[in-house]
Swiss-Prot record:
Residues 1-136 are extracellular. The cytoplasmic domain is required for function in axon guidance. A motif (PY-motif 2) lies at residues 229-232. Residues 227-237 are annotated as: Interaction with Nedd4. Residues 287-312 are annotated as: Disordered. Belongs to the commissureless family. A motif (PY-motif 1) lies at residues 220-223. This is Protein commissureless 1. Coiled coil: none annotated. Residues 108-131 are annotated as: Required for vesicular localization. It comes from Drosophila melanogaster. Interacts (probably via PY-motifs) with Nedd4 (via WW2 domain). Interacts with Robo.
Amino acid sequence: MISTTDYPTVETTTTAEELYAEYISAPASSMSPAAIAEHLQQNQITFEIPSAHDLRHIDALNSFNALLQRIGNAAVSYDPAPPSGWSPDGSISTEQLSKSVVLDLADLRDRSEESGESSWWSQIFGDADMHVIINYLWIGVVSSLVILSLVFILFSCYFYRKFRTWKKCNKDIRAQIHAASDSYSSHLVGCDASRLLLHQQMQHPHHRSSEAGFYQIESPPCYTIATGLPSYDEALHHQPRHFAYGMKFVYPSLAAVHHHHHCISNWEKQEPLNKLQKCKLSAAAAVEEDKADSSSSTSASASPSSSESSNLATATPAICINMPSGRQDEEVDNSDSDSAIAVAVAVAQSLQPAAPADDDCASLVVVVAA
């Protein structure tokens, strides 16, 4: 609001007519100029000029007042028993609207302030201290983390126990299958496999029965990382089918160079049966020519030519190569796998230090241990 004076507004109960009459009745001689000025200052009338914003606000209130009057009159006209305090003709007066809660601006302002103070924060926590609230929040967060950690640990222990049970069960089943059919071996550490073995014995005593029993073992749990991956023994079992061209898996393998005196001693024992000496003469062409001459000559000259060829053979140095016979190769090819493994283990236990580079008896031996 715009004010025309800086003096404070003085509230008085006297009207303008009374002040004017008092001023006229007082004689001019009885009042000094200071008293007259003080009297005028005390009885000064001030007024305020409304601004454009105030005028728009007043117009809006008048429009809203008229709207409420129309709505109220329409509602009261349909009500046969109007409430007390209404006019006899059933219309809403301006005084009633001014006294209502809707147009009481002071009441609306107080309500807005109260609603601002009574927010959702104050409704939930009330007058609690902020430090106490933060402490409670931290306690809740830590408690939730502890509970989640305990649940995770319990589930981890449960799944690990199930995995160990499955592993132990498969180990016992594979051990019993290996003892029954000697087809599979396991490197895993009870589980009752009597029903599985009984079902296996009722089938045909063939290699396929042990294979079927092997594949009836419980599969890995779905929560392990080994799902879908074959075991080492299973991979070795299927190896000949997928790699039928001589590819072979050996585990573990040991390669060492050692002295050959053990093999030489065994070789010398069976020398008359397992060895064949083949000698080649350096002058083979001359021998063939002598044989051709001896065949074309007479029987009289046969003895001198034969003696001459024998003398040539004795005069020429022979190169002899020791080679194993074909019988030994057949025996090695037809030997049993168990005896070969036993011999390999025996040779592995009797390994000697490596022979020097110029040793003719040194050989490379690859030992395969099951």
